Amino acid sequence: MKKTLGRVIPVVSLFLFTAASLLAAGQAAPPTSAVTWPTKNWPKGTPASVGLDEETLKNFDVDIATGKYALTDSFRVFRCGMEVFAGRYQHDYAQIYAKESKTKGPLNARLTGSYNYFDPEWHPFYQGTDLHTMQSVSKTVTSIVLGVAITRGDFKASLNTPGLKYFDVARVKNVNDWKRQMTIENLLTMTSGMNSEELFYPEGSDAPENDFVHMEASDDWVQYAIDEPVVEEPGRNFTYSSAGTELLARIFQKETGQDIDSYAERYLFAPLGIRHHWKRDYVGTVDTEGGLYLNDEDLAKLGFLYLNNGLWENKRIVSEYWVKQSVAPHVPMPYTVEDGRLYYGFSWWLIPSNGQYAWMATGFGGQELMVFPRPKPDCSVHRVGRSEWRN
């Protein structure tokens, strides 16, 4: 039986597909003579100046403001290197937290602390900053940073390198031939064969079967992840695994001698003018599976970097080869939309849309970046917020 997208990712994805259809209905983007790089600020434009229907976007803005798309904090559209639509929506999260902390739900499986995504004490977005939890968008950014390190020659290992190379096997549980075969590429493409499935639990992190909540409750996330059983041959099937992405934090540190957050700051975030916060687990390992915080303008820069094949201010940040491989359809996902089957790249979701793939980075609670590559509209749409999972 086919699995539809609505069963497995937040309802806000419907919001982005609606946005995609609005953008696709617009005119082709007018030619630009030169790229204006938004390192300091995004240049401003109007929807009409880039072939989009302003009235449609205004109506969409009203729908967001009136709550049609759950607790949306911001919605922005970028095209031709300009911000052409921006909406920000205010919510009293202190009041929401006071209410939501009394009853468990998908966004607050633990009533206090880091498992409650309404808790202002744990999330910088609520503390007078504009840094917003990215959740599993962090996985996509982890892939980008890995590509930067490979491009620079700092990460020398092949993607076919077994992950166990970076661990003391004598201290790893459940070692079998399949775990020995599990490679870095398997971790990037969610084909590790690990015994972890997260997307079929609409109750979110409150589901007892949901693997990532057990990992995040453990003292050492990487140890939990590497101890996890590998129950099928790696490379055969897509199985979404936050634990697999967390292993990349250890692998990156061992291979480069640097933590991935400090490396990203120097070679990715600083050149693009990106401010960030990247949290760590209890033993100090960078939370590569869900711990990144960015603002909305800076998230859009990452989409723009990929639209420009890894160049920024005409300097090479990540190789064009890595960009193309990252958004190539490596493994079919067991989900479909109207235009066809979804695929997964190197931690990018690939959504069939008008004869090509839109590239999506998506995270729990409605953190989403969708990029529409050329020759169709060269555009990115970004939404951050809170949303329930749909059943």
Residue ranges and their predicted role:
Residues 1-7:
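N-terminal secretory signal peptides that target proteins for export/translocation
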Residues 4, 13-126, 150-156, 223:
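N-terminal leader/targeting segments and the immediately adjacent pre-domain N-terminus
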Residues 53, 58, 81, 130-159, ...:
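Active-site SXXK
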Residues 71-73, 132, 366-368:
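Short loop/turn microsegments at loop-to-beta-strand junctions
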Residues 87, 97-122, 160-165, 203-233, ...:
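Short, charged, amphipathic alpha-helices and their helix-cap/turn boundaries
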Residues 122-128, 133, 151-195, 227-230, ...:
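Active-site helix/loop module of the DD-peptidase/beta-lactamase fold
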Residues 143, 190, 244-251, 290-311, ...:
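Active-site-proximal alpha-helical segments within enzyme catalytic domains
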Residues 275-276, 323-380:
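Active-site Gly/Thr loop motif
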